[in-house]
Structure formats: C-alpha cells, structure tokens
Amino acid sequence: MKLLENSSFEAINSQLTVETGDAHIIGRIESYSCKMAGDDKHMFKQFCQEGQPHVLEALSPPQTSGLSPSRLSKSQGGEEEGPLSDKCSRKTLFYLIATLNESFRPDYDFSTARSHEFSREPSLSWVVNAVNCSLFSAVREDFKDLKPQLWNAVDEEICLAECDIYSYNPDLDSDPFGEDGSLWSFNYFFYNKRLKRIVFFSCRSISGSTYTPSEAGNELDMELGEEEVEEESRSGGSGAEETSTMEEDRVPVICI
C-alpha cells in the first residue's frame, strides 16, 4: 500500500483537528494505492498461508440501526432476527488490514486483525449521514462549510458510486482509539476495485478533561517538524530536493 498525495485531503485534514471546548476532534482522510510494495508482498504471502485470496471471509454485521428488512435474517417461523453478515474475499481483507498498518505505523500493528473486526456498510447514504451527524454534533456550524468540500474531494478521488464501504470495529483491546476519554470514533474504508484504491477516513473525539496535546497524533508532530526543517533550510542553505513517484500509481477517475 502506498499513500497517495492529495492536496485537497491535506487542506481538509487541517480542519478536522479542532478543539471544541468540551472535546477535541482528531480526523484525517487518506488515499492509498492497493499496489503491493516489498513489505506488502511478504505480508501477503504469510496471509495467504491461512487461506487462498479468493476464499470468502465472514464479516461482522454493520453497527447500524434502522436496517432495511432485506438485510435482516429470518427465523424458520419467518420472524426477523439479527442483521445479515456480509462476506469479503481474503484479498480484500488484506487490503483493509494493510491500509490500517500503513496509516497507523509505527504505533500499531494490525497484522493479526480478523474478519469479524470489519463490517461492510449497507449503503453510501448511511455512511455519509453517520459521518455528517458525528461531525456536526461536534463542531456545529463550522461543519456546514466543510461538508460539501469534504465529500466532493472524496468523490473526486475514489468515485463513491463505485465503492464498497467497510468499517473497522475492533474490541477495546485492539482499538487504537480505545483510550480513556474517548467519546466516539469511526474508521471507514471506501474501496474502488476498478481503481485499485482505498480512501481511509478515520476520526475520533476525545474528552477535553482527559486530552493531552500528544494525543493529537503524529499528524501534528509531523507538521511542526516540517516547519522546523523549513526554517533550518532557510537559514542553512537549500537541501537536496526530494522526488516522488506517487503519481505513477494514479489512474484517471472516470465515474460512469
């Protein structure tokens, strides 16, 4: 998995880390190419020892309410029971796990994550509504201006109409956001098989009474570090320019 540069996401992410007084919101949106690199290939070989890539794995039912009757299982007497569980191929499951590893490294390792920690979401509209409700309840009026910008940027990057949407819902021991003071969190994967790309949207709210600046994550530290490097380069001369091949993994997004 390779992180793809996206200036729109970078601008949005700066607005997804905010202090509301009662809580601190820390969110980010990232785009990843599903093209496997060296470490990914090695991990994929180990992953396939437990089952072939095409084998289907059972996922947990989505953590949603108000599901349509078509997504509810029925007893022999015809009575509605719990929500139906979806399945995904082991290769897709690997992509989800690899995305988590890339996004949270080096602080967390998700290599042992299992299919029951993931869910396939019932619809795009439900996910959009869930995200909007969480962020609006946290930042109120400030989210009204950000909302169209956010979803337009995601759609341009991944073509939402073509995506399968998954979520990561671990137990407390495995949850990277399960620290004391955590009010809510979500982790959504927008997977476009045609583009071989995943957009990962992760966000959490931490109670202001338990929040410490270090919990803002590596994003803030990296931003501060980059500013320091820029200041040093201005005073100490220009350094070697970095080159990037991230754009080589991109293909044009054409929504049909």
Swiss-Prot record:
The lineage of its organism: Eukaryota, Metazoa, Chordata, Craniata, Vertebrata. Residues 61-76 have a biased composition (Polar residues). Residues 58-85, 212-252 are annotated as: Disordered. It comes from Homo sapiens (Human). GO terms for biological process: negative regulation of transcription by RNA polymerase I; negative regulation of transcription by RNA polymerase III. Pfam families: Maf1. GO terms for cellular component: axon; cytoplasm; cytosol; dendrite; inhibitory synapse; nucleoplasm; nucleus; perinuclear region of cytoplasm. This is Repressor of RNA polymerase III transcription MAF1 homolog. The keyword Cell membrane does not apply. Belongs to the MAF1 family. There is a cross-link at residue 35 (Glycyl lysine isopeptide (Lys-Gly) (interchain with G-Cter in SUMO1 and SUMO2)).
